[in-house]
Amino acid sequence: IKFQYSVKHEVKRVINTIETRTWLISNGYRFSLPQGLQDSQSSESESIRELIQKEYNKDLYEVAEKAISKSWNGNCKLIKEINEKLVDSHNLDELNVILTKYGTQGSYTQPNSIIVNVSAIPPEFLISTVVHESIHLMIEPLIKKNDVDHWVKERIVNLIIDLEFKSRFKMSPVPEWVVSVDGVFKQYYPNLELIMKKAPHVPS
């Protein structure tokens, strides 16, 4: 596991959040942006950089890195076992963790990078985001191959974590129609491809 954080990373994160803001709002996601950011600045990376530098506190990221590293050491064996168990999943040999204080709670970029928001929850609970986004990376190639709906994808990740970590982490809410994937999951896990092929689709 490797960590990265810098003002440069934060500028990129803020711009990406602004670009996807409409989608995030329509899907009920919470996200954070620098204080004082105006709509007129939304495409000006230099003015965004200035706002970020005013707020940037390296200690916040260092505390988060320490907390995640400690939790990772206690969980990496199980995460590797899950990866090996998931049929045809992407092998996550290494993980690049970019720490941020902006955007949503977490996100991922193939093949092996995740972004974790360190300001949304206490440091000792950040491992839940790391685990969640890591599972996303493992299953994303199959998600794309089978054209799986966003909320079905989220539910599959939640179900994997709930089962393998014995309900240690809270499951995030999904639309009601998605819950029907639970029965398919119980029947076919850990065969992801079968789960995805038999999973529900967005109601028309």
Residue ranges and their predicted role:
Residues 1-70:
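N-terminal low-structure segments adjacent to metalloprotease catalytic domains
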Residues 2-4, 8-10, 143-185:
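Post-HExxH zinc-binding segment in Zn-dependent metallohydrolases
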Residues 52-110, 123, 163-174:
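Auxiliary, metal-adjacent structural segments of Zn-dependent hydrolase domains
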Residues 98-102, 116-120, 133:
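Short His-Asn-centered micro-motif
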Residues 115-129, 148:
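Short pre-active-site segment immediately N-terminal to the catalytic Zn-binding motif
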Residues 128-141:
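Active-site recognition of the HExxH zinc-binding catalytic motif
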Residues 174-204:
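Pan-zinc metallopeptidase signature
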